[in-house]
Design a protein with these regions (language model features):
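Conserved active-site and SAM-binding loop architecture
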Residues: 1-206
Length: 206
């Protein structure tokens, strides 16, 4: 999947025919960009301080760092090419990724997120999951939504390590890893109406 995504981005970036040719400036791209090489844990791996690296030799850590940097560089190329394509074509793009001060794009990118949600439970999602959203060729609406929010939070200290079946079945997922990525419909609905749609549009349809 990643190789296909990379190939399509590379083609569009080089001006070759790509899936971006089928997207209109009136459309909106919502990108859930792969975060595994940007999240804050990546800095621990680079420093050789991850719990999994306790018994590694210095040589092993150095070898690992060289390969890890290549992987981070690949993802960094992809996210920049995606944005450049959208800039050139005037396409609207919203991209989400986890939020933390150690996040790679927070420290090493020229474009800042427009919206930061530090606790998604307050808008009806399952987990706290601090998230940042970049808006390109469009601005967040910042509509006010005066509606009660049902509290759907699944209480567990670490959504990956301590989540049991009792927790993850509440999201409709088959395992804890999938559950970590699930979005409660209420959170998605509120996000779209608060930041994406013009207020008059969703009010007239409600």
């Amino acid at each position: 999947m990643l190789s296909t995504f990379s190939k399509r981005l590379r083609g569009g970036y080089q001006g070759e025919p790509s899936l971006f040719d089928r997207i209109s400036p009136d459309d909106l791209i919502f990108a859930f960009f792969p975060c595994v090489r940007f999240e804050n844990q990546i800095m621990l791996w680079f420093r050789g301080q991850s719990a999994s690296q306790k018994k590694w030799s210095l040589e092993e850590k150095c070898e690992f760092d060289m390969n890890l940097l290549k992987e981070v560089s690949l993802m960094y190329d992809l996210v920049n090419k995606m944005f450049i394509i959208c800039i050139r074509k005037g396409l609207k793009l919203v991209m989400e990724n986890p939020y933390s001060e150690e996040h790679f794009l927070r420290r090493y990118w020229c474009y800042l997120p427009a919206v930061i949600d530090k606790d998604r439970r307050d808008s009806g999602d399952y987990f706290k999951k601090p998230t940042q959203y970049w808006f390109l060729n469009c601005e967040p609406q910042n509509n006010l939504i005066f509606e009660p929010i049902s509290y759907n939070a699944i209480e567990c200290k670490d959504a990956i390590k301590t989540m049991t079946k009792e927790h993850y079945v509440k999201t409709g997922a088959d395992n804890n890893k999938t559950a970590r990525s699930m979005i409660h419909p209420q959170y998605a609905d509120r996000f779209i109406r608060q930041y994406i749609l013009d207020e008059e549009i969703w009010k007239n349809k409600s």
